[in-house]
UniProtKB/Swiss-Prot annotation:
One protein family per Pfam: ribosomal_L24
Superkingdom, taxonomy of origin: Bacteria
Protein task: One of two assembly initiator proteins, it binds directly to the 5'-end of the 23S rRNA, where it nucleates assembly of the 50S subunit.
Protein name listed in UniProt: Large ribosomal subunit protein uL24
Any one GO BP annotation for this protein: translation
Gene Ontology, cellular component aspect: ribonucleoprotein complex; ribosome
Keyword line: Ribonucleoprotein, Ribosomal protein, RNA-binding, rRNA-binding
Lineage of the species this protein comes from: Bacteria, Pseudomonadati, Pseudomonadota, Betaproteobacteria, Burkholderiales
Subunit structure: Part of the 50S ribosomal subunit.
Family per record: Belongs to the universal ribosomal protein uL24 family.
Presence of the UniProt keyword Ribosomal protein in the record: yes
MF annotations from Gene Ontology: rRNA binding; structural constituent of ribosome
Length: 104
């Protein structure tokens, strides 16, 4: 069970996008995430007449390491860590600072 999942709001802790917030769009593998509006790179694409795609420079979301982001706690307005707690026989993610459940 992952501490940071798809559709979680996260905040970037280090790097050129430090302080930016975004929503996790997908997990690339166990250690990398693609976050909306964070770590955007410019990529050159060739025109492809088969698909109708025009060539040029496009913005592409690049993966960011999971250690460089943290969950955003809306109640406190700060970055927070996640832990797990057993509630009614179910494993639930909770914020470490407050102990309340992470809302998806």
């Amino acid at each position: 069970m992952d501490k940071i999942r798809k559709s979680d709001e996260v905040i970037v802790l280090t790097g050129k996008d430090k302080g930016k917030r975004g929503v996790v769009q997908r997990r690339v593998d166990a250690n990398y995430l693609v976050v909306e509006g964070v770590n955007v790179a410019k990529k050159a694409t060739k025109p492809n007449p088969m698909t109708g795609a025009t060539g040029g420079i496009v913005d592409k979301l690049m993966p960011i390491h999971v250690s460089n982001v943290a969950l955003f706690n809306a109640a406190t307005g700060k970055a927070d860590r996640a832990g797990f707690k057993d509630v009614d026989g179910k494993k639930v993610r909770v914020y470490k600072s407050s102990g309340e459940a992470v809302k998806v």
